[in-house]
Amino acid sequence: EYKAKIGADFPTDPKEQLMGAIKAVFRSWDNPRANVYRRDNDIPYSWGTAVNVQMMAFGNMGDDCGTGVAFTRDPATGANGLFGEFLTNAQGEDVVAGVRTPMHISEMEQKFPEAFVQFKQVCETLEKHYRDMQDMEFTVEHGKLYMLQTRNGKRTAQAALKIACDLVDEGMRTEEEAVAMIDPR
């Protein structure tokens, strides 16, 4: 399948594989979906894109491993508190694929107590730094927490209003900034 699509054998050299992946990300900046997304979200073409290269963390190496996704607040209601799910002995795609039923993020405290304490601290730090609700992906490998990604989380209109007001009450945003956070679309 790879050869039919690309016209060459899959490279066996890891450096060549990595460079191919990096080039694919940069090429994706010009695909039609990316162009539509930039236009719809007022993102200038000149910003370009970036590639992060990081060591792989494995959540599927036993019962002391796992992976999950979480928000620092409920994206449906805006309620302040961790909201998300995780799976033990799994990789990231397993959480979203629906192959297994994930556990609520609160159950992580029993499965990985030390990693959970650290996770809560990291969540608090990220939200304070970005001054907005965060949507995060993480892996636990043999009890050690690895944060893979964070971004400002998408939310319902109801949640957007509550989060904006709460961030003002918590001293993280001014009233003017909170109003500007609300997407009128």
Predicted regions and their residues:
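Short acidic-glycine loop/turn motifs at beta-strand connectors
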Residues: 74-79, 90-91, 140-144
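Short acidic, glycine/serine/threonine-rich loops at helix termini
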Residues: 63-66, 94-100, 146-151, 158-161
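Extended, highly charged
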Residues: 1-77, 89, 99-118, 175
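Terminal amphipathic helices with adjacent charged low-complexity linkers/tails
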Residues: 1, 86-88, 132-185
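Short loop/turn segments at secondary-structure transitions that flank enzyme active sites
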Residues: 59, 92, 153
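Phosphate-binding core of ATP-grasp and ATP-grasp-like enzymes
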Residues: 80-93, 122-134
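Secondary-structure transition/capping motifs at alpha-helix termini
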Residues: 75-79, 128-129, 170-174
